[in-house]
Swiss-Prot record:
Pfam families: GATA (PF00320). GO terms for molecular function: DNA-binding transcription factor activity, RNA polymerase II-specific; RNA polymerase II cis-regulatory region sequence-specific DNA binding; sequence-specific DNA binding; zinc ion binding. CDD domains: ZnF_GATA. Induction: Sensitive to nitrogen catabolite repression. This is Nitrogen regulatory protein DAL80. The keyword Manganese does not apply.
Amino acid sequence: MVLSDSLKLPSPTLSAAAGVDDCDGEDHPTCQNCFTVKTPLWRRDEHGTVLCNACGLFLKLHGEPRPISLKTDTIKSRNRKKLNNNNVNTNANTHSNDPNKIFKRKKRLLTTGGGSLPTNNPKVSILEKFMVSGSIKPLLKPKETVPNTKECSTQRGKFSLDPCEPSGKNYLYQINGSDIYTSNIELTRLPNLSTLLEPSPFSDSAVPEIELTWKLHNEEEVIKLKTKISELELVTDLYKKHIFQLNEKCKQLEVELHSRASVQSHPQH
């Protein structure tokens, strides 16, 4: 026997009569298997027989009628939400002892402003007081960058008015209970002219390198100029040779013209 799909009877009186006793003598639907009149949902099998929800589900799952021994007078409701809440509470209890979880939970409460820590409590750490007081995100001391001595000396060799001392602001922090005092001290000032003109100890090692670089540069320039001069002298010699050849040719042509002119002026008789 195979059960058809779940069926809610079309008559509203049937569903209303599910939890009402037969006190007025009217006919109420009755399960043909366990003869109960209380059920949250009425079903039918493939032959149209009226069954309660429990008998209908049992028949659909197992393919056989539900035994009478399984009949109960109380209707049990599912408690999924309660189980889920219990699971959540169980998980919360199991992870409540984790120090990382506790720290994150405290940090979340502090950042959202949902909680405050008593400053008089000796168990409260300085970090928690620091996070509660003043600003939630404290200022961190900037990382100091140490200038490279080689680069600094090279720059000083090229630009004699460029100091190598690092500039910046020094942030001082004092933690007293829950108060934070921050003070900015300007350490950088314009150097005096005498300070700029004084030789730097870092530049002594770079002086030979700079002098060698300038010497090499000057030698390259001298070689380039000598090459250019030799090229110009060669071109000048070529032009001189060509001019000399042209002068010789002009002289020969003049001699020929004079000879022809003399021959024409004295014809033979």
